[in-house]
């Protein structure tokens, strides 16, 4: 199935990402949750025809999750031997692929310094488990994504941040958003789509004012909502896709108020 490409009314977002990629710069995509950062990375991967290896960061991320680990394997002679299975970082370096580090500021600060040599001019790393020195082959690039201010995130270490060039990725809107809804959801009714876009604009405003979380206004939640509207009333669809995900009753009530104003 063909990849649904990233779209944005600001063409400089993708064009600059492509230019930085061509210059072999580390790219840091910075923006609210659900704004399309991963979709942008996937689109870039397809456009340059280079596979992408993804790391999903969390507080549980460790060096083995990045680099790989030792395991026991039975060889052709039936004997057991210890082998090292490459992780996403080493795979991407050896194969000249893209390394995508999602939500990089969710990782514990002490986990990431192992990547310093990967991210600077050296483009190499010494595998602490095997002693092998791996130097990235041509084609290797690094893209990372960050959700600033999101629950559970930590400020990025300045030494790490300085290894990236930043591109801000904001939510899409207007005709671009309308086209994305038609292409990526089941909802095709123009009048309903216009209502949903207006509702989403209200959610984004509330999110910027701190009344609700960013996830409630995300494109992911919006597309889920559009799908559900085709099989149930809009109010119930909003409850299933947005309201019931929220723990704070004040956030829930703020969205109920927005529903009353828009539908």
UniProtKB/Swiss-Prot annotation:
Binding sites annotated in the UniProt record for ATP: 31-38
Record flagged with keyword Mitochondrion: no
Matches recorded under InterPro entries: ATPase_dyneun-rel_AAA, CbbQ/NirQ/NorQ/GpvN, CbbQ_C, ClpA/B, P-loop_NTPase
One Gene Ontology term of the molecular function aspect: ATP binding
Record's keyword terms, sorted: ATP-binding, Nucleotide-binding
SUPFAM superfamilies associated with the record: P-loop containing nucleoside triphosphate hydrolases
Highest taxon above the source species: Bacteria
Classification via PANTHER family: MAGNESIUM-CHELATASE SUBUNIT CHLD (PTHR42759:SF1), MOXR FAMILY PROTEIN (PTHR42759)
Family per record: Belongs to the CbbQ/NirQ/NorQ/GpvN family.
Protein name: Uncharacterized protein SAB1265c
Source organism (scientific name): Staphylococcus aureus (strain bovine RF122 / ET3-1)
